[in-house]
Structure formats: C-alpha cells, structure tokens
Amino acid sequence: MTMRSVYYTGAGETLVTWQIDVDGAALAQRSAVTLPAPAMYGWPDNAREHFYMVCSDGGPYPENKHHYATAWKLAANGDLAPHGEPLTLPARPIHASLDRAGKHLLIAYNMPSMFTVHRIEGDGRIGGQVEQTASEFGLYGHQILATPNDNGVLFVCRGTDAGRTRPEDPGSLHTFAYDDGRLTHRRTIALGDNGLGFGARHLDFHPSGRFITLCVERQSRLMVFGLSQDGDLTPEPLHDVGTLSRPSNGRQAAGFIRMHPSGRFVYLSNRSFGWLDDGQRVADDSESDLVAFALDPETGAPSLLQHVDPGLFHIRNAGIDPSGRLLVCTSIEPARMPDGSIKPAMLAALRIGDDGRLTPANNYPVDVGRRQIFWSGMVDLR
C-alpha cells in the first residue's frame, strides 16, 4: 500500500488515524490518541511535521468549561504524539488553521463570536497570543482562513436560525488585511437583509487564486465570490445556486465544502437533522447526500453534475486525497431510520472519476456510543 495521505476522525476525545488505499478506495484504522477534550478541528503544518487540534467539552452554547489548543508531532506515517502542554482557550473553538507561512495559528470561536491568533514557535509548539485591534466579529463565527497570498484573512460567521424565544442572528463574511499575525478589517459582506437569510458556513479556495466557493449552510446554497490578489472579496457573489435536489418537510442544512485539487469540481453535503426521540436521532424524509458541481475555469460558474447517496445520515465532514481520485466523508452520529433500523455513524469512501462524478466504494461503520464524529479530515503526508 502506497500512503500519501491519512484520514483523521475525532469522536469525542478519541482521534483515530486511518490509512488510505486510494487505488482500492479502502481505509483501515492505524492508531489513536486521546485528546484533553472532544475534537473540534484539526490542521497540519506545511512541512507535515506537526498537527494542531482545537478541542472543547461542549456544544455551541457557553455552558461548557474546558477548551484547548493542542500541538502534536506528526510522523511520516500519520501517527501523532503530544508536543507540549495543551493551551487553555477562552471559549469553545469551532475552527482553526495556520497562516500560509505557518507562523501563526488562527482560531475561530462561535459564542462569543471572535477569533484569536497564536504564534507558532520554532519547534512547532503553540506560543503566545498576538494582540488584535480588529473588533468585527459578526455572530456565530464558524471558520477562519488566510488567503493564498497570506495578505488577507477571511472570517465566516454563520448566524443562527430563529428559535422559539429568540430571533434569527444574521450571518456575515468578513475580510481582513493580514500582516504577520495582525488583522485589519476591510469589508463586511452581509447579504439578504443585513445578513438575515445568509447563513454562511465554510469556504474553500480555487487553485487559480481568483475565486472562493462558499457553502451557505442555513439556506442550502453554493456561492462563488471573486478573490483579489490582496485577499479581498467581491461585495456580491458572482454565482449563487441551490444544493438541494428536492423539497422536504424536515430541517435541511448544507455541510462541508471541498474543492477538487484540479479546481474543476467542488463538492458539498446536504445534511438531514431529523429529530430527537429520548436522546436517539431519528431520520425523516430530508435530503442527506453529496452534491457535485463542475466549475467553469474562466468564470467560476457552477453547474450541477450529480447528487449521490453514500448511505450516511447527516454528513458533516469530508476530505479529498491530493491525487483527486478519492473522497472520504463521515456522518456525525447514529440515527434510527423510518423502518426502525439503526444506521451507525460511518465513514464512506467514494471514487472520483475524471469527469468529477462520485461512485460509492466502501463504507465503514464506527461505534461511537453517545459521542459524535464532530470533525474529520484528510491530511496529505507529502
């Protein structure tokens, strides 16, 4: 087996490394480590010598108590070993990434919505925090990424749906100038009614550096924005399409977004939430699938290729191997199907054709108990 990538799954405090056989579209568990709190998001350094994971013991609201950023030594085979003591964070981290130089760890938080920036020491450990003057934090931060030229940062804020006793919180997309760990606010993009009806979740960069693709979670949309060389975005999307194939009566939300290495295709998930019955997730007729789009190389315009059901419920995360031939995705937790059967939490491996279409290959049930596979991701070992 030739290994160029590994896939990580974080179920609670357990972070599992999976070997990948791209030719066979197969995965096998290799090793596992224990985190100080449940996995939230992970990111490797450029040299693939270190790996960073942010962790928290609770959900989206601030009653949880333990939040950390952790550094790990990353072996050539993908195994992880602790590297320094966990850094205590002020709130629940929801996303983390390194800047393009690998000198700073950028961390997004949802409640309160904010970000912090931390230096990376020469030995790969997490260092001190970089003080910021920026205060444009939006509502319900969800992702923070440095732009390809490392001169900008994009901060995605999802907002929240209205509840029984609270109104909707608006979503927004914030652009910042970036210089050696310091952010200066440039622009707030709040589509709809000042961000109402704009539940942005995650973005990914086109390899040309001219576009971003944005998953708008709460409205199940794919948007494409222009990206300038200085890291700013067009104030309006260049393109905007829906991700669902049919209407449903249940709660829907788009999930992950992943750009194909070639830039010719982009993939998203449509998530079904169902409802809770005595703590058990129960599926309904909502759409739970993957959707593939082709992207015009000149304009970035998306055109639908296919919807495919990988046999998973509530598909939260995915990764694509660097050859562009395999997509791996994960469901978040078990669910009871309408026929009474239990569909376990699972990993699914799908082949990617030259035309960008997905073909399901292998599924791997995982016993997570009452935990969730909140984060999973592909790491190219280079």
Task: Label each region the model flagged.
Residues 9-13, 60-67, 108-113, 162-171, ...:
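Short, solvent-exposed loop/turn segments at conserved positions within beta-propeller repeat blades
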Residues 18-25, 71-79, 117-126, 175-183, ...:
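Short loop/turn segments immediately following beta-strands, especially the blade-tip
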Residues 28-34, 81-87, 128-134, 184-193, ...:
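A short beta-strand motif characteristic of beta-propeller blades
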Residues 36-47, 89-100, 135-151, 193-211, ...:
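Beta-rich, blade/repeat-based domains predominating
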Residues 80-148:
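Asp-box/WD-like beta-propeller blade repeats and closely related beta-sheet repeat scaffolds
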Residues 254-299, 303-343:
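Loop/turn-rich, solvent-exposed surfaces of beta-rich toroidal or solenoidal domains
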Residues 333, 339-355, 359-382:
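Blade-level signature of beta-propeller repeat domains, shared across WD40, Kelch, NHL, RCC1
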